[in-house]
Amino acid sequence: MPELRKYVPAECFVEFRPKADWKGNYYGFDWMREGDFDISVAPGIGDSSFKEIIGKHYVSPGVVQPDGNKYKGDFKPDTGLFKSLETFYERTDLVFNDGTTVTNYTAFVNVYMKEKETKTIELQVRSIVRKSPESLELRCDRSDIVGISPSNLSDLGVNYGGKPHMQTIKITLKDTLDNPADIKVVSVTVDKDGLPAENIVGKLTICPNNKSNRKKKAIVLISVKTPSFSGLWFGKRGDAAGNKDFIVQTLHQALIDPQFEEYASFFTYLDLSDDPGFKSYIKEDAHQRKAVVNWSGSTGLEKYCYAKFKEYLKDMDPALENKYNGNDYLKAFYFGENLIAYDRDGSVIYLNGYSTADHEFVVMSGTAIQSTAVHEFLHALGLPHTFHAKGDYCYRGLYTENVLDYTHHLGDEFNNARISLYKWQWTKSNGNAQPEP
């Protein structure tokens, strides 16, 4: 058979997307958002085109929003930042026979698994065809570990200018990877001389996921019981144990395995219901309703709770008193009541949760939603909000399905919209976690 000629003009292009009902589960997946994939839990904002939402918020002409917790201000796209992002997603310009070009990008998938384990995931392949090739083949440079089914795409009909072909594929990993594995989509055609020719028209990178790339994070979940002040005759306890599955699936996107220790059962929790000192952390909100405030005098709520928690541990076993000191353990205190703070102007801010600058503590409110805890845990692992200008990349606030956005501010129907992490966030948070033992 004649030798294949490479890099001839393409007449189709192929892109990888998550499975249709993906909600951040099964794997981490990142791609250049172009507004072509409907994310069911984030209607109208999920997959907003990065070209339109990469930029910065300005509080006045030339002055970038300085507060990493706020997205207020005029938003302006940043072409330089977007070009940097295009490089990150490995932009490739495919040339059609008539000289026109189409831009294509590499997608990335992260699969959390252990050595000698086998895992199969489902993805979608999105293809646009101007002229039908002889075949569209999926080839992997690590076929000893990576299996692809089907390895040939079946729908090759011309659809340029119309609806893309969407086909589900299964990728089976027979073991972990110590280096990236590339799945390339190869368009096989016949050139003008009747010779077979091929061109790469799409690419997916499976990121390395062996032991040296997997990390862990030790997290202590602590349920706190407060005095009765919300109309109940008994004090409320925070639910510290009910949301672990979502925490696990989100951190697994970054190849981080959370390792929980819990003080959150009916018998083990931090009881502050009769604690005299805790009364100074009970204030009235803007509606004259009592709530827990994040600061009293010179002591943050988390520091006060930790001091009391250490007393509780010492009473249980003196050897436990200092077990959780330092940053090796992330301590998370869960309250059942509302949590508030005061802004610089004295106005009340309602909090679903917060993390401390020393990356040691997280505090959760009774108003927390599905993604609040892991949002705060990821802050503790070094990730800023997506709309923070000091992040590696900055996105328009409330326009993504990212866990580090404030998308839930759009309304209750978006409470489950924050499901994903970007590849650069995988790398940053993973680098701040602890090696797997």
Regions found by a protein language model. Give the residues of each.
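Intrinsically disordered, low-complexity boundary segments flanking structured domains
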Residues: 244-248, 310-322, 346-352, 383-395
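Short, solvent-exposed loop/turn elements at domain surfaces
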Residues: 226-236, 341-344, 410-421
